[in-house]
Amino acid sequence: MAEIQSNGRAYESLLEKVLSMNILSSDYFKELYGLKTYHEVIDEIYNQVNHVEPWMGGNCRGPSTAYCLLYKFFTMKLTVKQMHGLLKHTDSPYIRAVGFLYLRYVADAKTLWTWYEPYIKDDEEFSPGSNGRMTTMGVYVRDLLLGLYYFDTLFPRIPVPVMRQIVSNLEKMNLPTKPSGSTGDMTRGSEDTARRPPSVKASLSVSFGQRAPHRASTRGSSPVRRPPPTGYDRNGGDEVQQRSPRRSQSRDYYSDRDSDRQREREREKDRERERGRDRYRERERDYGNDRRSRRDYDSRSRRNDYEDDRSRHDRRSRSRSRSRSRSVQIEREPTPKRDSSNKEKSAVTVNSNLAKLKDLYGDASSQKRDEGFGTRKDSSSEEVIKLGGSSWR
């Protein structure tokens, strides 16, 4: 079965943050975990719901039963067939009202008129609020279309072109194009609506950047600053209907303006925070790149210095080894000129020495030659005797 064409928002963000958190933390909503089917939730609406305001009245000051069950429907994601069953239900008008609320929060704004048109003139009477004021289902549906506020809470905003088309369709049907006030739109912030607890709103709305819608009324409800009575008729007379809408409209205007300004300031703070984070990330990235490039430059320079020193050392060592080899070779191989001169010098010295000996002893070569012829035979015998020894004699 086809689901309802939604506006694309998550169901956790459909309601205001304060209301959503109160629903999720309520004991009654936790009891609804046991309801598993669509029909069980319908039976619970029939038995428990007696108004469709978002907050309970009296001293309870918590989320209403109707909105807890509406949130339960959010989690179930109803189909088109189930929604038609809700809108046409005959047992209780509050079952139908919860169905219309579901469409106002979940459905695409362009499809709202298609859903609501068959019920614009519905004359079934019921009391949307806890004050017992009666209205018809058709008026209630028109107020859901035309109003932005619903009993001190906010509806999703309908785009301006879609709203113009809705107003044009109502004009064609000769129906009012302004909210009638059945949903608390014209008396927003007054004491006859089931307001949220001030403590919850004051604490949670500030933390989430939302302006509490009750701020205009809490000043008037204070026992010290209570304004004098103005003859306000709660049951509603002609004079009250003429004056109170004007006051509530002006109050709503200023409250809306303040809330819009507050939201704009919060968004601007978020954007500035994001820009600051981006600038910080960019600085960190640039610093990391500079640090890496500096490290690479230092390592390259150290490597180049080391290679230069090593090459200089190698050239120096090679030159030293070549010089040593040359010196050794020169020492081992004397020049031939020095050798010839040495030989000549030695020959000269020998000749001079021989000349001196000849002068001293005479020329012995001639004497020996003369003696040799005379004594050749004798010398041979003597030599034989010398070689043979005494046995030869």
UniProtKB/Swiss-Prot annotation:
Mostly expressed in siliques and leaves, also present in seedlings, flowers and stems, and, at low levels, in roots. Phosphorylated. InterPro entries: PRP38, PRP38_C. Disulfide bonds: none annotated. May be required for pre-mRNA splicing. Confers salt tolerance to LiCl and NaCl. Belongs to the PRP38 family. This is Pre-mRNA splicing factor SR-like 1. It comes from Arabidopsis thaliana (Mouse-ear cress). The gene is SRL1.
